[in-house]
């Protein structure tokens, strides 16, 4: 095997190992709850909501940041469901698209994802000193 080929294979292997490690660490803050509904909500959230809400894309509130959610967890769930299902223009030019931009999600699926995000946010709020 030539040195060039060896280096290419080595770099590829290192990239695979690092990307797997990053992916595993990336899901770590998204804890799993015991409730069947929250387990289902977590799966929906990871597939549909994480892209914005894990990174603050377009001003999306991050559930792991208590400051982003302290005022939201006290709102009626019906309000949060409505914002997630029908879309919402928030302060500072933030925007929640209808159904997170996935028109195939049912109302019930959106509610499960919202419930998971609320539980995740409350978990991090409760962990504050």
Task: Identify what each model region corresponds to.
Residues 2-11:
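Bacterial N-terminal signal peptides that target proteins for export
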Residues 24-31:
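Cleaved targeting-peptide boundary
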Residues 19-21:
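N-terminal signal peptide c-region/cleavage motif recognized by signal peptidases
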Residues 51:
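Short, cysteine/histidine-rich loop/knuckle motifs that typically chelate Zn2+
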Residues 62, 83-111, 117-129:
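Axial heme c-ligation environment in periplasmic c-type cytochrome domains
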Residues 39-48:
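Local sequence-structure signature of Cys/Sec-based thiol-disulfide redox active-site neighborhoods
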Residues 42, 54-82, 101-102:
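Gly/Gly-Pro-rich "capping" loops immediately C-terminal to redox-active cysteine motifs
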